[in-house]
Amino acid sequence: MPTKNFRAFYRGLDDAVEGLYRDELLTLADDGKTPDFGFDSRIFERAAEWVRERGGVTPSMLQEPPARDVIDETFRILGGAVSSSISEEMPAELTGLLENNAFIFSGLKTYHSLNEVGLSLIGDDGGIKPFEKFHEDVAKIDAKYNRNYLYAEYNHAVTSSQMAAKWHDFQQDGDRYNLQYRTANDERVREEHQRLHNITLPVSDPFWEQFMPPNGWNCRCVVVQVRKGRYPESDSQQAVGIGEEITEEPKKRIFRFNPGKELKVFPDKHPYNKAPEAAKKIVAKLAEEIKTPEQAVRFIQEQEDRRAWFERGFKTLEVTRRKGVNGSTDMNGNIDMTRERLDRVLSGLTKLRQGGEVSFEEADALATFWHEITHNRNKPGNEYLTTLARRYMELANEFVARKTLPEFYESFGGKMQHPEFMDDRQSTGYNTWVRNYCSLIRKTGADPDKVLDAVRKHLFNEHYSQQAVGLVKAIKDSGATKADGTPLKVTEIKTLVKGCLLYGERMFDEYVNISLAEH
């Protein structure tokens, strides 16, 4: 059960939160009621019952399913507010930072709301509350946090994200334009915000570091670019003075920040952030988890070297509808995978992001993912292929993909894991073909590094219908010879490469040995 000092601290913190969200600070819907964002109250009720059974909340409990479900449900709404407010032109790394902040906010909000549930276990007389009374209080806490507060937080997330995106655009133009603060200019505008209306200053002015909208819950103010000289520039010190004056109260002062410059949706001084350091660390680690395909796409896009993996951009990662495949791609940045492999890709990417070790199954799924990424590096793009041409293409693609797996892992700041997949990946139907090709390289004495470089260059730059040519030429130009040292002819290598597709490994080895021994 919560201690007396703990209860006193959180009662005070709860009062601070309630003061921050008091009605006069919220501009509610026209009917005076906050809209329902579809938060699933059953999730909160299950978590509340779990808290009752555990006798309270500790930071470590945030990692357990009941609390995680509340965090995820909160983030579903607040994260959706962020993603729906930003255009596709916004760099993925910036979008990722904003969504990360919304997740952390969701986690700390959950910790605070569940702590209030824990406090409600004890009545004013110091005894355990009756079951019915406890659940009445839970319903009130749910309505307060997951409807009333959530309404203000959702609107704030929308405006903050929009202003962050605008700020990114403003930065591209520098001081070529001035920025002008504008209210909605109607009867609902707050008097203090009206005082900021039409303030016009360069983008580099310190005013924008503190008073970029939103400047309060449900603030509808915006900032727009205007041509220099069209409007008189405001006095910077006077503008800052007005901003400081209208946000002098502590509960208003928390909005003194620039979401675009700080790349945060919610201000650091929000009372939720007064959670224990242990809770903050756990939530920060949870925020690194990649739980959805959309998050995986953005994570891959965060770095320029990873964006270069896609000739036509990385757009979607989805569950495949095709049967009998591990994955597929249209080579236009859309990758499909089986549900099982996709889930393992997400968990594997999470571990790589956190510097952890991936499992054998995750490494296998990541190898499939890398195979499909490698397809997207082909410059000419998809085209109709005969069955034989497609087999040559898949041989070349899987050969390059598995031999360059270290590049994939190194892009996340780590070393190659499960290197066995560079030589043998039995989950793919192309495994025998590739192992035969690697055997051919060894038996002919061709330089494996030169072969890889040549096949890779041909795979990325030439039409898929011509990949047989690349596979043959790579071995020819890398010193391939017969057993007696006689250089192999192109026609001989063609026959041997075709054999990679026709025979099992043992039969292929015998076939190559016989072919290389012939004079």
Predicted regions and their residues:
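Conserved short secondary-structure elements within globular domains
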Residues: 157-231, 372-380
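N-terminal leader/targeting and assembly helices and adjacent pre-domain segments
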Residues: 1-142, 227-358, 362, 450-454, ...
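Active-site recognition of the HExxH zinc-binding catalytic motif
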Residues: 363-383, 398, 402
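Internal glycine-rich, Lys/Arg-flanked active-site/core loops of soluble domains
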Residues: 123, 131-175
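Non-catalytic terminal regions with compositionally biased, polar/charged low complexity
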Residues: 453-461
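Hydrophobic (often cysteine-bearing) scaffold residues that line and stabilize catalytic clefts
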Residues: 150, 362, 366, 389, ...
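Short secondary-structure subsegments characteristic of cysteine-rich extracellular domains
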Residues: 237-247, 420-441
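Post-HExxH zinc-binding segment in Zn-dependent metallohydrolases
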Residues: 387-433
